[in-house]
Amino acid sequence: MTPYRDVPPVSSRTHSSNRDRSQSRSRMSHESGSSVSTTSIVFDRISERVAAGDLSEKQPRGDDNEDALKDEPDNDDLETGPFLGNASGNGNSPRHAQKKGPGMDRGMRRALLIAAGLLVSAWVAGLFVYIATKSYKPASATAHDPQATIVRGSGKAVTLDQVMGSFWRPEVRSIQWIAGPEGEDGLLLERDAAGKDYLVVEDIRSQDAAAVDSSADAQAADARTLMEKGSFEYGKRVYNAVKVAPSRDLQRVLVATDVKSNWRHSSYAAYWIFDVKTQTADPLVPGEPDARIQLAQWNPTGDAVAFTRDNNLYLRKVGSDNIIQVTKDGGSEVFNGVPDWVYEEEVFSGSSATWWSEDGDYIAFLRTNETGVPEFPIDYFLKRPSGTEPKPGEEAYPETRKIKYPKAGAHNPVVELKFYDVVRGDVFSVDISGGFADDDRLITEVVWAGKQILVKETNRVSDVMRVVLVDVAARSGKTVRTTDVKAIDGGWFEITHQTKHIPADPSKGREHDGYIDLIIHGDGNHLAYFTPLDNPDPVMLTSGDWEVVDSPYAVDLDKNVVYFMATKESSIQRHVYQVKLTGEDLTAVSDTSSEGYYAASFSIGGGYALLTYQGPGIPWQKVISTPSNPRKYEHTVEENKDLADNAKKHELPIKIYGTINVDGVELNYVERRPAHFDASKKYPVLFQQYSGPGSQTVNKKFTVDFQSYVAAGLGYICVTVDGRGTGYIGRKNRVIVRGNLGQWEAHDQIAAAKIWAKKKYIDETRLAIWGWSFGGFNALKTLEQDAGETFRYGMAVAPVTDWRFYDSIYTERYMLTPQANGHGYDTSAIYNTTALGQNVRFLLMHGLADDNVHFQSSLTLLDKLNLAGVENYDVHVFPDSDHSIYFHNANRIVYDKLTNWLINAFNGEWIKVASPKPNGKRRAA
């Protein structure tokens, strides 16, 4: 589900800015002794009790409505104790009666004091011996061990302030690889680097001369400055660069300033053509420096720019002030070269629907007609997205933005691929027989292959896909491949944007043009090489009981080598591999001798790669020469030393990975335990999940997030299980959810909870589940399906509650249309309010300006609860917040609310308020 990408992954987001390393001054009370050993705390307590004349009985325990963070004298585990509450979870244990016993005589008191003194002296002596023999090792001297199953030490506790800020985020460098003017490989853009001009083209090998293999011809290219400063003057104003894109010949830079966000990926900006030689800029639209441009792109040869303004496509050639208007029908309901809301969100995951041909002679662009798409209003009560001031007298009214939003079963936008011949100056389309009707067509990917172009189309419900090959010069085309996914496994076609054109080169053994695509093969997705372009029978480059992910990454055309990422070692790991175009010699690029979760970014020619290790250990990054490159190079660009130091000094949760068997299917899980986990205790459990189709939450990344805080900071156990429907456990386990979202996803969470409830260290009366977006939907569906039998509590943020309310392209892929699957929509909705009423309590939160999962979902559920008289829930709404819930400190409030609500749940507070009664007697009116 697209909402998955918007779920704020607290503290797992990457960034390149300097981290705020300051510690929070408002530390929780239970942290105050974190730097002192447990042993010393025990002796301090003995001394306190001796001084108080009390060694015979435990201190009374307060009611659950006392400070949840208050230390409990009868529990020496400072991390878990304050948060465990009553083992029964009912919040009604009485205060122990305090009986005043007979006084202790002075002789006995003196003897006890002497004995305590001797014990303390012996302990101090033992401590000196311990240190002298180097047996003692402070927490700050122990490196983070992701494989640890037990933590002993007295490091600092993980706090919510830390996970909400940047304290636990790895520093991640990004490299913008570019092609050299003469075809050089290994060139990159450096932007705003310390001690350098603002925008510089460098050879990666110049970053570390010592890393270059001196035995090879490895001379680095000279650095070249494109922009000396990040700002420039035009007229009487200074403009600051926000986005930059150099031309292929590096003579000019396309610069965006004054960028204003539109939807998730799209924005408006003023665009400029910056001249490298003169260091001056001119507006992309001559004479209009403040023109609001939606998209601008260089052509591959660097002598023209295509751009979209007011939903019309334009062209400007370098050296000319003449603007060519390619289309004239753009407006509020017709888009040219940019996607509408649903295509931006669900198909392209980006703001561009413009594709230049490799020689710059043609532009392919998507024309989207929204005329028949219904509008959905979004009200803004505090901000004005339009940027305009209200009319006099209308200041007290909200601004309403109407979005063309196709819900399940409603009219979809009509899309068609158009072409512009730059030389002839005309727009044309190519009709190909056997295609889908206008109301039954999605265009999901467009890839140029020389003078020809590959187009992927599917039917509306995404279970039949065809690949069309268009000869643009001849203005003709044909269907070269059709896949009936429904017939294969009953599932759906998964959109990808990684298809790679492989040009013909007889000298390299490639007689014809071809392309590499990710296709269904066996029970997963694998790489296939189709050559010639119209050949429907591929050479399989990969196969096996594993899957290729978001690939191919890159292709070295000189060596006929393909680089890709896959789950070959484990479904919760990611490694980088290479394979020849013949399907032979599949070998690993990353180190597979140990567990790892890698990502990679390859240079244009595939000779170099930025290899990013994301876990389970402390993340690091290296730039390496690829195996096909004879010039050996390796340079570490990020070690995350500060993060490693933080991990040493803090008590991170213990992560236990494994699988559980549910109905014969092995499901991945990760259990996060408190650092000082004690199997003799009874812990409450929070289940966190997303559960959306094809998603994965259990993985081997290094992450210290909200779930980590729940375990390490609150002392609860936090479990994540990827149930059926999620990714990388085989397509048969993925597509089983089609037609009835929520049935198997909720079933598997309940089955997992029953497994944990039987564990000796789990308090089965205190189980909760939470999620955001699809995870919020599944949290509610789980509570509904379980009806209080296993789970007692739930927290849902921005949930879908009826799939009729969500967008058509996403929903119908998994549910078909409401017209064809009405019963499935009925049963997948959150409808059984009686079952929800059998839980102790649940929490619902939503942003009022959510353009993705509309507030309509939560309002409809609230209406159902009202009609049924169900009141065991709390609601919090966030004005003007979209799906990510950030406006006006909202994101922090979300996690504060989750934290405090969960503490109250596990302390039994919600049981107390279930049947409120007045204190004392009141006289009837």
From Swiss-Prot:
<keyword id="KW-0325">Glycoprotein</keyword>
<keyword id="KW-1133">Transmembrane helix</keyword>
<feature type="region of interest" description="Disordered">
    <location>
        <begin position="1"/>
        <end position="104"/>
    </location>
</feature>
<keyword id="KW-0735">Signal-anchor</keyword>
<keyword id="KW-0926">Vacuole</keyword>
<feature type="active site" description="Charge relay system">
    <location>
        <position position="883"/>
    </location>
</feature>
<feature type="transmembrane region" description="Helical; Signal-anchor for type II membrane protein">
    <location>
        <begin position="111"/>
        <end position="131"/>
    </location>
</feature>
<dbReference type="GO" id="GO:0008239">
    <property type="term" value="F:dipeptidyl-peptidase activity"/>
</dbReference>
<dbReference type="GO" id="GO:0008236">
    <property type="term" value="F:serine-type peptidase activity"/>
</dbReference>
<dbReference type="Pfam" id="PF00326">
    <property type="entry name" value="Peptidase_S9"/>
</dbReference>
<keyword id="KW-0031">Aminopeptidase</keyword>
<feature type="topological domain" description="Cytoplasmic">
    <location>
        <begin position="1"/>
        <end position="110"/>
    </location>
</feature>
<feature type="compositionally biased region" description="Low complexity">
    <location>
        <begin position="31"/>
        <end position="40"/>
    </location>
</feature>
<keyword id="KW-0472">Membrane</keyword>
<dbReference type="GO" id="GO:0005886">
    <property type="term" value="C:plasma membrane"/>
</dbReference>
<dbReference type="InterPro" id="IPR050278">
    <property type="entry name" value="Serine_Prot_S9B/DPPIV"/>
</dbReference>
<comment type="similarity">
    <text>Belongs to the peptidase S9B family.</text>
</comment>
<dbReference type="GO" id="GO:0004177">
    <property type="term" value="F:aminopeptidase activity"/>
</dbReference>
<keyword id="KW-0720">Serine protease</keyword>
<dbReference type="Pfam" id="PF00930">
    <property type="entry name" value="DPPIV_N"/>
</dbReference>
<feature type="glycosylation site" description="N-linked (GlcNAc...) asparagine">
    <location>
        <position position="369"/>
    </location>
</feature>
<dbReference type="InterPro" id="IPR001375">
    <property type="entry name" value="Peptidase_S9_cat"/>
</dbReference>
<keyword id="KW-0378">Hydrolase</keyword>
<dbReference type="GO" id="GO:0006508">
    <property type="term" value="P:proteolysis"/>
</dbReference>
<keyword id="KW-0645">Protease</keyword>
<comment type="function">
    <text>Type IV dipeptidyl-peptidase which removes N-terminal dipeptides sequentially from polypeptides having unsubstituted N-termini provided that the penultimate residue is proline.</text>
</comment>
<feature type="topological domain" description="Vacuolar">
    <location>
        <begin position="132"/>
        <end position="925"/>
    </location>
</feature>
<dbReference type="InterPro" id="IPR002469">
    <property type="entry name" value="Peptidase_S9B_N"/>
</dbReference>
<dbReference type="GO" id="GO:0000329">
    <property type="term" value="C:fungal-type vacuole membrane"/>
</dbReference>
<protein>
    <recommendedName>
        <fullName>Probable dipeptidyl-aminopeptidase B</fullName>
        <ecNumber>3.4.14.5</ecNumber>
    </recommendedName>
</protein>
<feature type="compositionally biased region" description="Basic and acidic residues">
    <location>
        <begin position="55"/>
        <end position="72"/>
    </location>
</feature>
<keyword id="KW-0812">Transmembrane</keyword>
<feature type="active site" description="Charge relay system">
    <location>
        <position position="850"/>
    </location>
</feature>
<dbReference type="InterPro" id="IPR029058">
    <property type="entry name" value="AB_hydrolase_fold"/>
</dbReference>
<feature type="glycosylation site" description="N-linked (GlcNAc...) asparagine">
    <location>
        <position position="832"/>
    </location>
</feature>
<feature type="active site" description="Charge relay system">
    <location>
        <position position="773"/>
    </location>
</feature>
